[in-house]
Regions:
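ABC transporter nucleotide-binding domains
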Residues: 6-11, 16-215, 219-220
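Pre-NBD coupling/linker segments of ABC/ABC-like ATPases
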Residues: 2-4
Length: 359
């Protein structure tokens, strides 16, 4: 019998090799019930391969994965009944209405016609799509298709939902609606959600934890504040400063040289809004403030970064790239990996159809 604190996804030493290419390399990961987990990484990092192994659609080279205690390779059919998959490009029958698409999905998952209609009506209201229920799916915008996609996934009452770029190509208001819905599915329904995405801002807003994937390896995993603190423990401190002189934000050679002269400063840059971003190997707040005040600058803002996922991702990614030193151990380097990536895309494109087959 499972409880709220049980792990829903457990991955142990999971690897997938294509010849010498390590698409996924010794992955260990645990995702809790009701957790929203963001999986970040560039194309070819191993995110899609990991998803395919979780869904039992490709066998691992080594290691294993379980979903709610079920072996993803040996018990893939049972896993399929627990998992809903939302691809980045949701496909529906364009000549059928949104309602009819959901009813069809419900029937494919073993519901009677009456049960399918009732559940479709309830879910369309839940995702805010009742107004478009009788419109043909082919007329839907991308945001509407994504919401219908979430509704389609919910028809089978999943315990886990795996989403691939759920907010890509959607306008800001649509993004807010979808991210709010995702958070509600975890908080109110207790559904475990794993999101694979490049959208760092949205991942930061809704995820309980994130994992950063680079070249087949999970190089960092944890809450965003934890990852920021880990960087500081490794000697990386980040600061944002707004400084003015004579009422204007400053960014001249004299100002830059003054900042660079502070012991420990490694990087100085300017954001679009005029905020100065500084990175250092130690905590320079006191020295920085003293230098600015003594040079007659007015300090409007100064705070230490640590919860900005964009900076965290960039730093971990740069560290992983430096460690690899240009080696071709993962990702999509080389002709073999290119061929493997093409194969994975073809398999991934069939996921929606596979998961609509139901029980």
């Amino acid at each position: 019998m499972t409880t709220k604190n049980d792990s829903m996804i457990t991955i142990t030493n999971l690897s997938k090799y294509y010849g010498e290419v390590k698409a996924v390399n010794h992955l260990d990961l645990e995702i809790k019930r009701g957790e929203v987990f963001g999986l970040l990484g560039p194309n070819g990092a191993g995110k899609t391969t990991t998803t395919l192994m979780l869904l039992g659609l490709t066998d691992p080279t080594a290691g294993h994965a379980t979903i709610d205690g079920l072996d993803c390779t040996k018990e893939s059919l049972a896993v399929k009944n627990k998992v809903g998959y939302l691809p980045d490009n949701v496909g529906f029958y364009p000549a059928m209405t949104g309602m009819d698409n959901l009813i069809f999905s419900g029937r494919m998952n073993g519901l009677s016609k009456e049960e399918a209609i009732k559940r479709a009506e309830e879910i369309l209201e839940r995702v805010g799509m009742t107004y478009a229920a009788d419109r043909k799916a082919g007329t839907y915008s991308r945001g509407m298709r994504q919401r219908l996609g979430i509704a389609d996934v919910l028809m089978k009452k999943p315990e886990i939902i795996i989403m691939d770029e759920p907010t890509a190509g959607i306008d800001p208001s649509g993004v807010r609606e979808i991210t709010t819905l995702i958070r509600e599915l975890a908080d109110k329904d207790g559904i475990t959600i794993m999101i694979s995405s490049h959208d760092l801002y949205q991942i930061q807003r809704i995820s309980d934890r994130v994992g950063i994937f680079v070249k087949g390896k999970l190089i960092a995993c944890g809450r965003i504040d934890e990852l920021g603190h880990q960087l500081m423990s490794k000697g990386l401190f980040m600061f944002d400063v707004v400084a003015e002189k004579n009422g204007e934000k400053v960014w001249n050679e004299e100002f830059q040289n003054m900042i660079r002269s502070i012991n420990g400063v490694t990087i100085i840059g300017r954001r679009v809004d005029g905020t100065v971003h500084i990175e250092a190997t130690r905590d320079i707040q006191k020295d920085l403030l003293k230098a600015l005040v003594e040079a007659d600058y007015t300090v409007r803002e100064m705070h230490q970064e640590g919860g900005d996922l964009t900076e965290i991702y960039r730093k971990y990614f740069e560290a992983a790239e430096a460690e690899e030193g240009g080696s071709h151990h993962g990702g999509d380097k080389g002709s073999t990996a290119e061929s493997s990536a093409d194969k994975l895309k073809k398999v991934a494109g069939r996921l929606t159809a596979v998961f609509k087959e139901g029980k």
